[in-house]
Amino acid sequence: MSNRFAVILAAGKGTRMKSKLYKVLHPVCGKPMVQHVVDQVSQLGLQKLVTVVGHGAEMVQEQLGNVSEFALQAEQLGTAHAVDQAASVLANEEGTTLVICGDTPLITAETMEALLQQHKEAGAMATVLTAYIEEPAGYGRIVRNENGHVEKIVEHKDANEKELAIKEINTGTYCFDNKALFASLSKVSNDNVQGEYYLPDVIEILKNEGHIVSAYQTEQFDETLGVNDRVALSQAEIIMKNRINRKNMVNGVTIIDPSNTYISADAVIGSDTVLHPGTIIEGNTVIGSDCEIGPHTVIRDSEIGDRTTIRQSTVHDSKLGTEVSVGPFAHIRPDSVIGDEVRVGNFVEIKKTVFGNRSKASHLSYIGDAQVGEDVNLGCGSITVNYDGKNKFKTVIGNGVFIGCNSNLVAPVTVEDGAYVAAGSTITENVPSKALSVARARQVNKEDYVDQLLNKKKS
C-alpha cells in the first residue's frame, strides 16, 4: 500500500453559526466536529495528518493535541489556498492525499477507505467522493464521460439544463496523487467573482492534462453533511444520535425510547443494560452489563460496574462498583469512588469521597471530602461538615460505623471502626472504636408549660 496522507480543512470563520465558538469545535453528540473527523481518518493508516487552521487555531490545536500536525491559513482565500498551506509538510511526499472538511462529523472511515480503494483501482490522479440525491439544487454536478470517469464538476449556477438534471453531486471530499495535487495548486487561478482559489479547479487542471479523474459514489449521503449553521448542526446531532443508539442496540443494549436517549460517541455500554427515556450518557463513560439506567439520568465521564441501578440521578467523573443502587434524585459529584453493593438513596449528595462496600446513605445526606469504610450506615440527614468558609477538611468514617439520623460530623474528624453516633449529634471530636458518642443537649420536659404560656397571653 502506498503512503497515505490527509489534510483536514478547518480554517473557515463559520460566520453562519453566529457563535463565539470556533465552528469545527461545536460538539455533535458531545464531541467536537473536527475530533469526529480526526478519529475516523486516523483509522486509515496515515503516514501524516495535517489540519489547516485559521480563526481559533490555538483552540483547535489544544483539542487535537499531537494527533495532527498543523498549518496556518492566516487569510481565508479559498479551499485550494487552504490545502496549499500544508505544502511545507506534504509537497515532497510520494503517495495519496485525502482532503476533507473539518465540519463533516458524520463521515466514516469505511467510506473514506472505499474512496481510496476506488482511487487506486482506477489509476486516477484525483478521485471525488460523490452522492446521488433527488433534490440536488445548490450542489456541484458530476459530469461523467463514456468511461465512467469524471469529465468535469459543474457548479449549480453554471449548469445548463442537461447538467441540472444530473443528480450525482460533489460532496467536497477528494483524494489525490500527492505530488500532482501540490503541482496543480500553483496553477489554480482566483479569477472568479469571490476572488478565491477553489480546490475543484484542481480537478479540471488534472483532466486537461490528460489524467484520469475518478469518482466514488457513496450510498450514505448523510455522511457527507457539512455543518455550516445551527440547523445543520441539529441535523448532524440527530443522525449521529441515531447511529450511536442503533450500534448499541445491535450490541445488546436495550434502549426503551431511542428518540429520548442520548449517548456520546465515546461511551461504552455492556450487554443487557437497559436505558430508560431521558437518559444522557456523556463523555468517556463506561457502563457494565445488566445495569438499569434512568429514567432522566445524566452520567458523564464515569465508570459504572455491572448490575448497577441509577434512577433519576446525576453521576459526574466518578467510579461506581457492582450492584450499586443510586437514586432517585441522588447526585454523585466528581472524584467519588463508590464500592460494591452500596446504596445511595434519594436526595443524597456525594462529593470527592471514597464510599466503602455495602455501606448505605439512604436519604437526605451530604457526604463530601470523606473516606467512608465498609458496612457503614449513614442515617437520614447525616452531614459531613467539610467547609469552614475558607478551607475544606476531611471526614474519616471507619468500618461498621452507625451514624444516627440528623447528625453533623464537623471535619476534620474521625469516627473509628464499630462506633455509634447517636441521632441528632454534632460531632466535633474523634470517636473511639466501638464507642457510643452522644453530642446533644439533654432533653428537658417542662410540665404544664403550655397552659402557663397561654394563660399569660390572655392576661
Curated annotation (Swiss-Prot):
Enumerate the catalysed reactions.
alpha-D-glucosamine 1-phosphate + acetyl-CoA = N-acetyl-alpha-D-glucosamine 1-phosphate + CoA + H(+); N-acetyl-alpha-D-glucosamine 1-phosphate + UTP + H(+) = UDP-N-acetyl-alpha-D-glucosamine + diphosphate
Q: Which InterPro entries match?
A: Bifunctional_GlmU (IPR005882), GlmU-like (IPR050065), GlmU_C_LbH (IPR038009), Hexapep (IPR001451), Hexapep_transf_CS (IPR018357), NTP_transferase_dom (IPR005835), Nucleotide-diphossugar_trans (IPR029044), Trimer_LpxA-like_sf (IPR011004)
Protein residues bound to Mg(2+): 103, 228
Positions that bind acetyl-CoA: 386-387, 423, 440
Segments for region (Pyrophosphorylase): 1-230
Any single Gene Ontology cellular-component annotation: cytoplasm
Q: Which GO terms describe its molecular function?
A: glucosamine-1-phosphate N-acetyltransferase activity; magnesium ion binding; UDP-N-acetylglucosamine diphosphorylase activity
Which CDD domains does UniProt cross-reference here? GT2_GlmU_N_bac, LbH_GlmU_C
E.C. code = 2.7.7.23, 2.3.1.157
List every stretch annotated N-acetyltransferase.
Answer: 252-459
Q: Record's family?
A: In the N-terminal section; belongs to the N-acetylglucosamine-1-phosphate uridyltransferase family.
What protein does this entry describe? Bifunctional protein GlmU
Q: Which organism is it from?
A: Bacillus cereus (strain ATCC 14579 / DSM 31 / CCUG 7414 / JCM 2152 / NBRC 15305 / NCIMB 9373 / NCTC 2599 / NRRL B-3711)
